Swiss-Prot record:
Its main location: cytoplasm. GO terms for cellular component: cytoplasm. Coiled coil: none annotated. Signal peptide: none annotated. One of its GO terms (molecular function) is ATP binding. This is Aspartate--tRNA ligase. It is found in: Cytoplasm. Belongs to the class-II aminoacyl-tRNA synthetase family. Type 1 subfamily. Homodimer. The keyword Cell cycle does not apply. PANTHER family: ASPARTATE--TRNA LIGASE, MITOCHONDRIAL, ASPARTYL/LYSYL-TRNA SYNTHETASE. Pfam families: GAD (PF02938), tRNA-synt_2 (PF00152), tRNA_anti-codon (PF01336). Catalyzes the attachment of L-aspartate to tRNA(Asp) in a two-step reaction: L-aspartate is first activated by ATP to form Asp-AMP and then transferred to the acceptor end of tRNA(Asp).
Amino acid sequence: MRSHYCGDVNKSHVGQEVTLVGWVNRSRDLGGVVFLDLRDREGLVQVVYDPDLPEVFNVASTLRAEFCVQVKGVVRARPDSQVNAQMKTGEIEVLGKELTIINSSEPLPLSLDNYQNNSEEQRLKYRYLDLRRPEMAQRLMFRAKVTSAVRRFLDSNGFLDIETPILTKATPEGARDYLVPSRTYKGQFFALPQSPQLFKQLLMMSGFDRYYQIVKCFRDEDLRADRQPEFTQIDIETSFMTSEQVMAKTEEMMRGLFLEMLNVDLGEFPRMTYNEAMRRFGSDKPDLRNPLELVDVADLLKEVEFAVFSGPANDEEGRVAALRIPGGASLSRKQIDDYTKFVGIYGAKGLAWMKLNDLTQGLEGIQSPVLKFLNEGIVNEIISRTGAQTGDIILFGADNATVVAESMGALRLKAGEDFNLLEGQWRPLWVVDFPMFEKINGSFHAVHHPFTAPRGVTPQELEANPANRVSDAYDMVLNGCELGGGSVRIHNQEMQSAVFRILGITDEEAKEKFGFLLEALRYGTPPHAGLAFGLDRIIMLMTGASSIRDVMAFPKTTTAACPLTNAPGFANPQQLAELGISVVKAAKTED
């Protein structure tokens, strides 16, 4: 039905007859000549119909936006005065000779031109219309090119694309599982995989030493701008490769991807330990475009008569951190109060501050509600450590270390945006040396997942002192987003059992949930390591989209619903009976 895509017609086709199909983007009658912009996935082209062909002209006069049509005509160059440099096809136009209306269109329930006026609900309900917008089409085409480039790289490096099961067994990986009831085994359930983690490890045990898969994963968790109930991973696993080799290979892939797709050379990725990232930036995925850093000052404040500072300063689990904002002395009291409310979201009880109005006047040139508790030596040392100057403000977070990191790390990002401090477009890094475990409510939890190997300890040493052990794990971070995370895996049954015990998983529970893995670890398991990238997040960053929903064809809402299909929906009674399921309706509450 077509000879060319609309967006591909150019000056080399002048004088040629072309057949185009697509949608009417805009139609206008100017002085007896009908101009229409015809659109397909590759772009727009202007088609002109004049009254010399009255039958065709009359049909062209009836066209409205989003009519699906076929056009036959001859390509001609536009006069210099009519060249449109804003259009890919702006040097030419097509003189229409034939016109077929394939399908008409009713008035659209949403605007494709002023899409900002469309609600998120509208855009998702009529997603097939929203995807006609060039911006959306270009993102999905970009995504297709990225996955093609990833496959090409991995294929050429000896990786095998192997599928793993979608219907599997529930395993504790951090989020809630989506469960699928079994008809043949009443009362039993499959789980949709949160990742192919265990299956790809089993593939390593099977001898397939380089595996990859671009795979759907499912997590029933609270949603944010960068979360969806179903998402896509670039999943990679290797045998007989160290963490350094895995990092080198995947960094090579990512650098090549950015060079090919965006003509951007990311350069060599720097390394940063988890502890350094948390200390300097309050985050294990720091945005290095932001020059602001947290500075520890607790050692200066142990003896001050201000419990807000001295309490955390003398607490082993406490922290007092200072954040210098260049030019921040211009902040009004209301703006400081807004920052105080902001850190409160992350558990902070308040925000102390110090405005450096004129350092040539000593303490007289400093404005701060906490200045009366600090002597000149302490103030000067804080100014020296933070590198603050006249016109700056220093903000203080004082609490347990976790609250300080989360609240001041978030404030660092906000202040960097508010004061336009971001430097450079792309700042990648590797974060390494993560702790093996974190303690939550008195119990140990895996920082990555239960199959991550510790670095340089025996199972006995790990169980004797789990709190201070480092894992052989690594995260790739770009502009404050975690692109992917991975680790060396445990390939020894004794070590795996030790980790389960530390996590409070009894031997009986481990056998019930992970018996197949523990069994497999008995039969010559090779050392193996891997990494998984979040494809949706990578595309979001590369295209500048504000949400991963804008780089997925048919995403869910923030409440995990699909307005297009009205999913999820109720099952009919017959289906439920076959599955042995009865639905318990919530009891009505009286006012």
